[in-house]
Amino acid sequence: VWRVTLDRDGAPLLFDTIHPCGCYHQFVPTARLVARPPEPGVEEGALVVQALPALETGARVRLSIASGPHYLQRVDPVAPGAALPSDAEDYRFEHESALRALPLAGGGSASLYGPDGIVAGTERPERYALWISGIESPGAMRQWGRHATAFVGRRHFDDAFLVDRYFARAPK
């Protein structure tokens, strides 16, 4: 999952990503933000894997993703009008709501998600080690809005105050 948080003027402020289970929450702030110092205590802080320079108007970002596990490896700014590499892949976006009404062979439809928001059959072995975190089935793919992103403390991907919690405006 890749998210772009826009500033008041419509320019990118922060990029962040999670695996569809909620794990591996990584932050890539632009030059408009600086990371706040970690709060004292045992809570997981923000994992800032990279900071981007100021982006030109019209610039894009290129995501380098590992082919097997699909982990984010790097984010690079791409100048406006620059050609994409010849090996770049185009992906078609589908609205996530389509996964809640998948057509069945015999007619009707069914949701990809169970009543608990978890995708059946995506359980991973780490759930046995991380059950104590209180997160149901850690490592399993889950529905939007059900992504806990920390095993220590409380943090959710859709927290409205997430940016303010971990970042401050960079001095001008």
Regions found by a protein language model. Give the residues of each.
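A short, surface-exposed beta-strand/turn
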Residues: 2-10
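Domain-length functional cores that host ligand/cofactor binding and catalytic or interaction surfaces
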Residues: 9-172
